[in-house]
UniProtKB/Swiss-Prot annotation:
SUPFAM superfamilies: Glucocorticoid receptor-like (DNA-binding domain) (SSF57716), VHP, Villin headpiece domain (SSF47050). GO terms for molecular function: actin binding; metal ion binding. GO terms for cellular component: actin cytoskeleton; myofibril. Transmembrane segments: none annotated. Interacts with F-actin and ABRA. The modification Phosphothreonine is found at T473. It comes from Mus musculus. This is Actin-binding LIM protein 2. InterPro entries: AbLIM_anchor (IPR032402), Actin-binding_LIM (IPR051618), Villin_headpiece (IPR003128), Villin_headpiece_dom_sf (IPR036886), Znf_LIM (IPR001781). Residues 269-278 have a biased composition (Basic and acidic residues). The gene is Ablim2. Expressed in brain. Highly expressed in caudate/putamen, moderately expressed in the olfactory bulb. In the hippocampus, expressed in the CA1, CA2 and CA3 fields. In the cerebellum, expressed in Purkinje cells. Residues 544-612 form the HP domain. The modification Phosphoserine is found at S282, S294, S365, S368, S453, S477, S579.
Amino acid sequence: MSAVSQPQAAHAPLEKPASTAILCNTCGNVCKGEVLRVQNKYFHIRCFVCKACGCDLAEGGFFVRQGEHICTRDYQRLYGTRCFSCDRFIEGEVVSALGKTYHPDCFVCAVCRLPFPPGDRVTFNGKECMCQKCSPPTLLGNSAHVAQGLRSCGGCGLEIKNGQALVALDKHWHLGCFKCKTCGKLLNAEYISKDGLPYCEADYHSKFGIRCDGCEKYITGRVLEAGEKHYHPSCALCVRCGQMFSEGEEMYLQGSSIWHPACRQAARTEDKSKETRTSSESIVSVPASSTSGSPSRVIYAKLGDEILDYRDLAALPKNKAIYNIDRPDMISYSPYISHSAVGDRQSYGEGDQDDRSYKQCRTSSPSSAGSVSLGHYTPTSRSPQHYSRPGSESGRSTPSLSVHSDSRPPSSTYQQAPRHFHVPDTGVKDNIYRKPPIYKQHAARRLDVEDSSFDQDSRKKTTWLLLKGDADTRTNSPDLDSQSLSLSSGTDQEPLQRMAGDSLYSRFPYSKPDTLPGPRKDGLDLRNANLAPCGADPDASWGTREYKIYPYDSLIVTNRIRVKLPKDVDRTRLERHLSPEEFQEVFGMSIEEFDRLALWKRNDLKKKALLF
């Protein structure tokens, strides 16, 4: 890059023979009459203008830069060098010292304010430049040795005779010898020293630099140390409050997380305040006034010596079979219910209303017109959950199966039955996430009193519903109509009767509504209905539910930024929405290997992958 200041362009008449055409260097047309000549090039007077502003250059000075002609004002504005002392553009002779440029008259001694004589030694004490007369005298004891040492270059070792010298690291250097020890780059600005040797910033960081454990960048300037970790002051943030740490403030370090002392104490206090109120093998449910959106509506579960808190239970689906305890201490009997023919609807307690309003297994056929005389629950080898019921004697009661008609709500009398009896402990602690119970539902004699077209003879019908936690079939379609659940056209078609009432108290407290087909002699008619078991585990295996695949970036959850996840994802099973290839990349193992890990290990891996 070169810029040459040119005098005014010369007006020259066209002296070449007419046979040889002279072209304008700007427009390329033939030059006729009076032209301008700059070096060996010719221009029309109207074509010789500034490249930047377009002003006429025929009457003033200009600069040539990379073949372009620029006026003085634009050249200084675009490419000019300013004096470090007076901040004006430098034209002509320039003095460079310590990476800065000066006018010769502006580069003066800091003490006597006189310009430095040509060839005089310049002493730089780290702040100011002083001439040889104003520099501090050397010690008298070894003046000859010191004087000789000051005249030797710290880089090449040669004597500094005439010209300027650079003082750095207690040595004198030729201006061209003060270079980086590693890459040999000329150090005319900032540098970093190590063991008396100068380095540029990049090479110093590559050899001796300290990386920030927060942003993984090199630390220049202030550094915050926490144990063996180092941080920029702006990168050390408390994981609880997100605030920075002040200088000298105490901090707690836990893994890769750092805490303020007050924030850590507050977190411990919150952990201690969570006390379990359960028996040896029971689950505490929230009051009936709680919202139904809380995960499984469970706060704590105690199974033997193991206590499962909300974080462990949050990793399970909302209807996970956590209630299927294979080794119960108690087995509860359902109370007896008697219905009257005509009366107002029975008002239940607050706990019953909450259970009834939740998702329950019931029939959805719209053709029911009769009433049911009795419905009861048959206990199996597994005990149902104990619920808090206001007004009961012991604070516990048993779930019951109450059946009502939609058209005629009967009134019922609630009679308490013996509550509990003990079962010997088998000593075997089974897996609580498997072996859901088998329910048996008996429908007694049904009478149709409103439709004269139906048969008046009473028939005894029994419907068996087997619920299996590992069932592979699920109902994915909308509510089935009565035609899809009816019998074939060759037989007597019996109208589907809906179990009257909106509440069905089964031993599984939270379950999904399903449609049951019409009964026949040998049991359920499964030709036209694809039954989904109530309370079945939707995440028992990868094959029972199809998870929509999303990229890993859209599933990440952090505590600093509120991330909006897709609507159809399972928030407790975010890793199920990864493709097998991306799952292998994120967790370093296959899906089958991940499922064989313990629950706490899976949760720990999900936390590290920001999927928890």
